[in-house]
């Protein structure tokens, strides 16, 4: 599939995603994960934060979200997002020792809809309450920000956790992600879990496989065909050929049903058939009893430009709590 064909598919997916907003059930919750690319990166280029920040906020509003996690949010970006998205509450300390410096992985939630019963940030380490602590060979300090939310209309509760796991140590990714899941079980006291993030791994690697034993990848739980691209990280550029998520899920035809059970089951000679489709490292996981109505990788470019609001695409899911 050539670039122009892929772009057609990506754009064609957008009306499907947003038209559904008007007809989705009243108790449905739209969640997302979005790595927004840290502000010090790409200075003096068309992808600088100052050049793209307004388009990023516009895309967040267009997605019509109820709760979402972001990654690589620096202090200046956090200030801007708080100011420009006043309808959302922002929860998440930065990962520096003072809790105010370096990147954050915050959770946003719509204030008119939810009440936060519990919230916080902890570090992905053997001493999670110690700011800037590191374990398991991690290259950077890493955090999880979380909430226990109650829907004001239905009274239903759920945990929302968001993180950006290490890009070097696979052990740190696995240990950190399992720490998050166990803590959400504890904090939520049995409430369903939504777990988002840039996990810096493919779904066939140990960290994702470990989490998949407890939670479910929302992509494979979707009751409708996913829309948008397979890859979520594009690094500001595309390859000559791209594949949509729907096409990827048909390769081979049995892969979708198989992966609902065990992603490792489809490996051939140690390789997963999806590996050729590019890096899909941004995730939404949900508890097994959470329904997923739809799932999308949102490929919107900045208006009038062949540029994007971030070097990652956001991923979204519309869910219904049990």
Feature map (PLM): residue ranges:
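Metal-dependent phosphoester-hydrolase catalytic domains
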Residues: 171, 184-193, 201-322
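N-terminal export leaders
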Residues: 3-7
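Structured beta-strand-rich core segments of catalytic domains in phosphoester-bond hydrolases
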Residues: 67-157, 161
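N-terminal, active-site-proximal structural segment of metallo-dependent hydrolase catalytic domains
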Residues: 8, 18-84, 97-102, 178, ...
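Active-site metal-binding loops of divalent metal-dependent hydrolases
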Residues: 36, 163-165, 198-199, 313
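Surface-exposed cleft-lining segments at the edges of enzyme active sites
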Residues: 40-45, 128-136, 163-170
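His/acidic metal-ligating clusters that form di-metal
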Residues: 141-163, 170-210
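Active-site neighborhood of phospho(di)ester-bond hydrolases with catalytic His/Asp-centered motifs
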Residues: 69-71, 93, 194-198, 218-220
């Amino acid at each position: 599939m050539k670039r122009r064909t892929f772009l057609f598919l990506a754009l064609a997916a957008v009306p499907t995603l947003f038209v559904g907003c008007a007809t989705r059930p009243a108790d449905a919750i739209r969640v997302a994960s979005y790595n927004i690319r840290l502000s010090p990166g790409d200075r003096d280029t068309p992808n600088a934060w100052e050049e793209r920040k307004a388009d990023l906020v516009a895309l967040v509003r267009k997605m019509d979200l109820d709760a979402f996690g972001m990654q690589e949010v620096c202090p200046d970006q956090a200030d801007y997002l708080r100011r420009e998205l006043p309808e959302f509450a922002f929860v998440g300390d930065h990962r520096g020792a003072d809790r105010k410096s370096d990147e954050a992985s915050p959770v946003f939630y719509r204030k008119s809809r939810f009440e936060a019963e519990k919230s916080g940030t902890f570090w992905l380490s053997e001493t999670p309450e110690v700011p800037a602590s590191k374990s398991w060979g991690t290259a950077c300090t890493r955090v999880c920000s979380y909430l226990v939310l109650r829907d004001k209309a239905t009274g239903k509760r759920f945990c929302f956790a968001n993180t950006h796991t290490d890009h070097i140590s696979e052990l740190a990714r696995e240990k950190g992600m399992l720490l998050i899941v166990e803590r959400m079980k504890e904090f939520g006291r049995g409430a369903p879990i939504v777990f988002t993030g840039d996990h810096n791994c493919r779904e066939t690697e140990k960290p994702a496989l470990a989490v998949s034993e407890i939670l479910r990848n929302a992509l494979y739980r979707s009751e409708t065909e996913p829309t948008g691209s397979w890859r979520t990280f594009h690094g500001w550029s595309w390859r000559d050929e791209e594949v949509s998520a729907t096409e990827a899920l048909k390769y081979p035809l049995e892969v979708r049903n198989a992966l609902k059970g065990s992603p490792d089951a489809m490996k051939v000679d140690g390789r997963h058939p999806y590996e050729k489709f590019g890096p899909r490292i941004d995730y939404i996981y949900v508890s097994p009893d959470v329904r997923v109505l739809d799932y999308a990788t949102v490929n919107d470019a900045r208006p009038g430009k062949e540029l994007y609001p971030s070097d990652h695409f956001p991923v979204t899911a519309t869910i219904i709590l049990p």
